[in-house]
Amino acid sequence: MLDVSNFERMRIGLASPEQIRAWSSGEVKKPETINYRTLKPERDGLFCERIFGPTKDWECHCGKYKRVRYKGIVCDRCGVEVTRAKVRRERMGHIELAAPVSHIWYFKGIPSRMGLILDMSPRSLEKVLYFVAYVVIDPGDTPLVKKQLLTEAEYREYRDKYGNAFRAAMGAEAIKELLQEIDLDQLAAELRQELKESSGQRKIRALRRLEVVEAFRSSGNRPEWMIMDVIPVIPPELRPMVQLDGGRFATSDLNDLYRRVINRNNRLKRLLDLGAPDIIVRNEKRMLQEAVDALIDNGRRGRPVTGPGNRPLKSLSDMLKGKQGRFRQNLLGKRVDYSGRSVIVVGPELKMHQCGLPKEMALELFKPFVMKRLVDKGLAHNIKSAKRMVERVKNEVWDVLEEVISEHPVLLNRAPTLHRLGIQAFEPVLVEGRAIQIHPLVCTAYNADFDGDQMAVHVPLSAEAQAEARLLMMAAHHILNPKDGRPVVSPTQDMVLGAYYLTTVSKGARGEGKAFSSYDEAYMAYLNKVIDMHAMIKVRQEDGQLLETTIGRLIFNREIPIPKELGYYNCEVDKKKLTEIIARCYQLLGTEATATLLDGIKKVGFHYSTLAGFTIGIDDIVVPGDKKEIIAETESAVEKIDQQYRKGLISEEERYQKVISLWNNATDTLTKKLMAGMDKFNPVFMMANSGARGNVQQIRQLAGMRGLMADPSGRIIDLPIKANFREGLTVLEYFISTHGARKGLADTALRTADSGYLTRRLVDVAQDVIVREDDCGTTAGIEVREIQEGNQVIEKMEERLAGRYALEDVRHPETGELLVAANTMIDDDAARAIVQAGIKTVKIRSVLTCKTRYGVCRKCYGRDLATGREVEIGEAVGIIAAQSIGEPGTQLTMRTFHTGGVAGDDITQGLSRVEELFEARKPKGQAIIAETTGTITAITEVRGRREIEITDDSGEKFSYQVPYGSRLKVAEGDHVEAGDELTGGSVNPHDLLKVKGVRGVQLYLLREVQRVYRLQGVDINDKHIEVMIRQMLRKVKVEDQGDTDLLPGSLVDAFDFEDANRKVQEIGGKPATARPVLLGITKASLATDSFLSAASFQETTRVLTEAAIKGRVDPLLGLKENVIIGKLIPAGTGMSRYRQLKLVTPAVDQEEDGAEAVDMATGK
């Protein structure tokens, strides 16, 4: 067999009949499978041992030769080779067909490749192939035309008239003869000539034919190979037959399909030998063609062949397609050994890098390691007795298990794994019970809670795998979230509450104003109840300074302990503050210190939230006294508006808007009163204020009023819910509430599926983007400024600058001082300095302009958000980007919000908008954009429709019709730039590409995607979105081929296009011209260089058909292709630069059985 790790690229093509015969180990002549009495395979049948190899290791069919010593002998009685049974997984057979048949992929696929190369319509092809009509092969000297179709009657008539002067035939033989006659070079020349001369439909047709002809020419495939004389039979182990309990057999559908082909083929052979009448033979040939079609792609033409219970049989194509197909089920995701799963519970005493593993689980997972250690320590004589000891769970086993698992990390995974933090490594600690314990702080990353969630454990076996788990995947290293570079392990709930309670100040508490000589003295006073935890006191520091603080804050700083470098935190510490402390600690002191700090916060937080003894009761929900007045005032104002409406002074729409804004104001006023009137130590208030649980909106609903609700369509009902949950709702109010709740649940269910599919498409389009070099040397970049929506800042300038490389020197506009030199990274301080200097735009290096082929360079990507340092070569930034965009997808709201009113403002939001942008679809409610830079000279109204006229600088006029009901964004006399929106709505990115070019559309997409996420309160770094947009703009469409070999109208990779032009220009030829195209992510994934990646994504058969005809070569550059063929992925430590390294492990002297133990331990 082929050595998997030893080839560079993979090629797909059409197989010639000779090649199929060369693969085969023998011809399958009979449809029998196994003998029903002996249950042994029948000779020459579909499971024949002579063809495919023995069913038992080292044993022939008749039993003359048994045992290894006869290896390689072919038995003289039964003809079976004595070898391993696993050759039945790789040896193929073949069926010699009595008549050629066409391959359904090439005749029925869209476009029909056979039809294009013969210049026949698929319909007429079908007539010939399925014996409905004759096709003229050689007209001789008759008035017939080559490839003309004749019905039965016409054929007879011409036969009578001209005798044998012409040749016509039907079926695949006829098509095969026509295909054999094609001279590809001559045909290509003719088509190129026709391209130059024709136009319109004919030109398009010629182009499509030329594409297929060129594919055949360049790949070395012959057109007649689309017709098959021989059919390969796949190895029997890949279409197994197994005996069930009841003595019946279950078999793969393929065996049924093959059996039909063999039966019909044998019948056809017999009929031909007998010299049966033409019509019978023809019918049999047609049935053979249909049987082969069903085998290759059942259901593609006509009704599918069904098995028992009317279920369509699974053909070879179905084996590859879809989620259950070979690609997605077995090649991209495999089941693994050395794994287990169990319910999770919290382990508050664990360190950041630990997890609790149940004893029985650990023993089973580490069994081989334990067995080897038992032998090494002399507690067992050989592996067999060690195995017995483990199975009987002897006492010594537990001590050995402790030794084995120390320093051996395990991986914990929680489904759904939405981003890379869904799998992390921990050091196991043995625990009693049967539940896995996990550290409370990693719950955020896993999105785990303890209401019955389960997690899976995996054991990395090899030394390399353990090293990677320890150095790259340890939970203590994953402090920052790759999507925005903020800490992902900040404390939540109880811990936040504890820290907040500890650092709050209470006015006039016991012992306020007292002074102490040291921390210890103050702490003793606190323990003896002389001072209250929240009282402001003065304490002398070690440096002699008097510090005014509370004992709680001293404890917070001392007990955690907060590192000296971060200073003393003398303030209320809520969730935001805690996150900030962690982020600063990580920046200044690195991973180890942060992990220690986190464990400290966890301990102190839990301890003091317990001491605080929080409870909430109905009395803690205080309804403000002036609620009645606020509501009464609003009601009377609403009544006035209703009167105005009834008098006809205002329209229904105005009334609706006014009522809604009145009630919203009332709710806001009430909320402000409510929050102001709450006691600072009210438990409900403390929970919300500290960020532990709940928020102002929820308190408002408990103690203020529920406010306005939306109906099922999303329109706000202008009748508010005036009650709150403390007072209780009336029946009507309750009914109105249910709309929103139901919609929320339905939305969530739909959103999860949509978001998962979006992530899958994003991963697919960006999976081959890896950091491949240090600097691509580009001189281009993008200009960044802050993103605004109306008067609200969506993304601040410094967020966009931090961690990127400056393209040119950035100087202070007034002093001229150099803030950042060109090609150096802008760190957080520099970004702040730039913003403070009042600089509004900065040019930075960006992924969008990176010149690296098949990836990006370190300088264009900038900082790796998960580590806060410059990105490493080999980082799979494409997949990280896809996960960062996809993971928050579930949080985005689904539907279009019809916020009452403003016509034309109905633009899609939330997840659907993100999808619309990444798929580059034409948006609903499209905005009109200016094609040129100029001034608006007139806005006129023609028959109820408005028209905008723009005059550009040269005096040329452009006019645009505004559809009825659209909102204008411009007025007469305004100056507009090319690409500016003239009306409200979303811009069609394809139009923008034409008007503003690549850079314009890139920045537009980036801004729009950011807008959706930011307005939902999700922060994603620009660079992740940039990676995706770059993938969408990789291709160009050739317009004029010049002297290159490129075909006009074809999509080519931008880098390939430049290469082709460079080659032509070097020899002084005319370069080709092309225009950039914007592809949606699905299209871009299918247009990738790798056919393996595209085929495993969607439309498997279409991708493979095209790839085979073109003889595509997969360079195996992406991650997916390499996973599919089982190689190491070319990222991280799998990059070629690390491949040459050999891992040396110090050898231990072992006896015979010791060596065997090593083999078992590595799972070989």
UniProtKB/Swiss-Prot annotation:
Residues involved in Zn(2+) 1 binding: 60, 62, 75, 78
A single Gene Ontology CC term: DNA-directed RNA polymerase complex
Top-level taxon of the source organism: Bacteria
Cofactor: Mg(2+); Zn(2+)
Cofactor note: Binds 1 Mg(2+) ion per subunit.
Residues annotated as binding Zn(2+) 2: 776, 850, 857, 860
Enzyme Commission code(s) on record: 2.7.7.6
Top EC class, one word: transferase
Reaction equations catalysed: RNA(n) + a ribonucleoside 5'-triphosphate = RNA(n+1) + diphosphate
Record GO biological process: DNA-templated transcription
Pfam families: RNA_pol_Rpb1_1, RNA_pol_Rpb1_2, RNA_pol_Rpb1_3, RNA_pol_Rpb1_4, RNA_pol_Rpb1_5
Gene3D superfamilies: 1.10.132.30, 1.10.150.390, 1.10.1790.20, 1.10.40.90, 2.40.40.20, 2.40.50.100, RNA polymerase II, clamp domain, RNA polymerase Rpb1, domain 3
Keywords, sorted A to Z: DNA-directed RNA polymerase, Magnesium, Metal-binding, Nucleotidyltransferase, Transcription, Transferase, Zinc
A molecular-function term among this protein's GO annotations: DNA binding
InterPro entries: DNA-dir_RpoC2_beta_pp (IPR012756), DNA-dir_RpoC_beta_prime (IPR045867), DNA-dir_RpoC_beta_prime_bact (IPR012754), RNA_pol_asu (IPR000722), RNA_pol_N (IPR006592), RNA_pol_Rpb1_1 (IPR007080), RNA_pol_Rpb1_3 (IPR007066), RNA_pol_Rpb1_3_sf (IPR042102)
Residues holding Mg(2+): 449, 451, 453
UniProt-listed CDD domains: RNAP_beta'_C, RNAP_beta'_N
Signal peptide: none
SMART domains: RPOLA_N
Known role: DNA-dependent RNA polymerase catalyzes the transcription of DNA into RNA using the four ribonucleoside triphosphates as substrates.
Family: Belongs to the RNA polymerase beta' chain family.
PANTHER family (UniProt xref): DNA-DIRECTED RNA POLYMERASE, DNA-DIRECTED RNA POLYMERASE SUBUNIT BETA
Subunit structure, interactors included: The RNAP catalytic core consists of 2 alpha, 1 beta, 1 beta' and 1 omega subunit. When a sigma factor is associated with the core the holoenzyme is formed, which can initiate transcription.
Protein name in the entry: DNA-directed RNA polymerase subunit beta'
